[in-house]
């Protein structure tokens, strides 16, 4: 069984037992969270689409860790003008383990 969930402005296809890095959510490590914005649920050849969400569907997950992604370096330069600008960014994430999918 799989589901398509929406969290942090992005959509993810998940199945039970998968680990996933999503945008940071305020939750303690080891706590169980419920992701209730389920867009689709499928099993085998059957697929249940929401309009826009599937009624009564939820995905239960456990928070494994909180962290930060690798640094992304931004470099701007104007040729012949001696203008150079360096900037870096590290995005926070939450790693979750999908426990069950309730449809």
From Swiss-Prot:
SUPFAM superfamilies: L21p-like. Keywords: Ribonucleoprotein, Ribosomal protein, RNA-binding, rRNA-binding. One of its GO terms (molecular function) is rRNA binding. InterPro entries: bL21-like, bL21-like_sf, Ribosomal_bL21, Ribosomal_bL21_CS. GO terms for cellular component: cytoplasm; ribonucleoprotein complex; ribosome. Part of the 50S ribosomal subunit. Contacts protein L20. Belongs to the bacterial ribosomal protein bL21 family. This is Large ribosomal subunit protein bL21. It comes from Polynucleobacter asymbioticus (strain DSM 18221 / CIP 109841 / QLW-P1DMWA-1).
């Amino acid at each position: 069984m799989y589901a398509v969930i929406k969290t942090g402005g992005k959509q993810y296809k998940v199945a039970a037992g998968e680990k996933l890095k999503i945008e940071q959510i305020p939750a303690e490590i080891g706590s169980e969270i419920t992701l209730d914005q389920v867009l689709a649920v499928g099993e085998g050849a059957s697929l249940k689409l929401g309009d826009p969400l599937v009624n009564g569907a939820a995905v239960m997950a456990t928070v494994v860790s909180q962290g930060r992604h690798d640094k992304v370096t931004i470099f701007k330069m104007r040729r012949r003008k001696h203008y150079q600008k360096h900037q870096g960014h590290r995005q926070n994430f939450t790693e979750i383990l999908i426990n069950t999918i309730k449809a």
